[in-house]
Curated annotation (Swiss-Prot):
CDD domains: RNase_PH_bact (cd11362). Its EC number is 2.7.7.56. Keywords: Nucleotidyltransferase, RNA-binding, rRNA processing, Transferase, tRNA processing, tRNA-binding. HAMAP family: RNase_PH. Phosphate binds at residues 86, 124-126. Signal peptide: none annotated. This is Ribonuclease PH. It catalyses: tRNA(n+1) + phosphate = tRNA(n) + a ribonucleoside 5'-diphosphate. The keyword Methyltransferase does not apply. The gene is rph. Homohexameric ring arranged as a trimer of dimers. It has been suggested that the active form is the dimer which binds tRNA and that the hexameric form protects the substrate recognition loop (approximately residues 65-82) from proteolysis.
Amino acid sequence: MRHDGRQHDELRPITFDLDFISHPEGSVLITAGNTKVICNASVEDRVPPFLRGGGKGWITAEYSMLPRATNQRTIRESSKGKISGRTMEIQRLIGRALRAVVDLEKLGERTIWIDCDVIQADGGTRTASITGAFLAMAIAIGKLIKAGTIKTNPITDFLAAISVGIDKEQGILLDLNYEEDSSAEVDMNVIMTGSGRFVELQGTGEEATFSREDLNGLLGLAEKGIQELIDKQKEVLGDSLPELK
C-alpha cells in the first residue's frame, strides 16, 4: 500500500473541468490528485513564417508554473528574463505530442497555441499537461468544425500521458506523486495514443539501473493507466467530436 492509500497500479483521482476559462477556444482544468493544471487552446489564423504558403497548420505549446504551485515559492521565469531548460523541454514535449495526432494539412494554415499553467504541483505536471492539453485542443477543433472553418476533423487519435516508476520497496508504481518521484530508483514518462501506439518515452535510472523485464513492466503499467485516462477523455468529450471514437 502506498503512502496515499493507492494500489501500485492505481491512478490518482482525476477530473477534467471543461470550459474552465471562458475566453480560449478550448479550456480544461485537469486535476490529478493534488496536481492541478489549466490547459488552454487558442486558435490563430496564421502560421509561423517557415510554414506560410504550404497549406499546413501548426500546434505549439507554452508551459509555466505559478510561484506557489510548489511547497517553496519559486521566482517567476519572466522575472529572470529567460525560461529554464526544463521549461523549454516540457514545452517542446507537449507540442510534439499533440502534433503526432493531428493531420496538419486538414488543420489548414492556422496555429493552435497551447498554454499549460500549473497552479498546484505534486508530481506528474508534464504528463497532466499533455493529457489536459489534448482535451483543450479537441474542444477548440470541435468549435472550428461546428463553425465551418474546417471541413473535416484533423485529429487522428486520442492522446494521453502518465508517469511510472520503480520504488526500492514497493516495485513498479503507476502515476507517481512528488514524494514517490523524488525517491524512485527509476522514473519514466510515457505518451501513447488511443490505439496503443507510443509517441514518446522518457526513462531514467536514478543511481540505479533497470532490466528489459523492468522496462516491459513499466510500459505495461503505463499502457493500462493511459487507457484509463483516454476512457475518461472520451467520456467528458461525449459527441462533441463524433468523427473521433
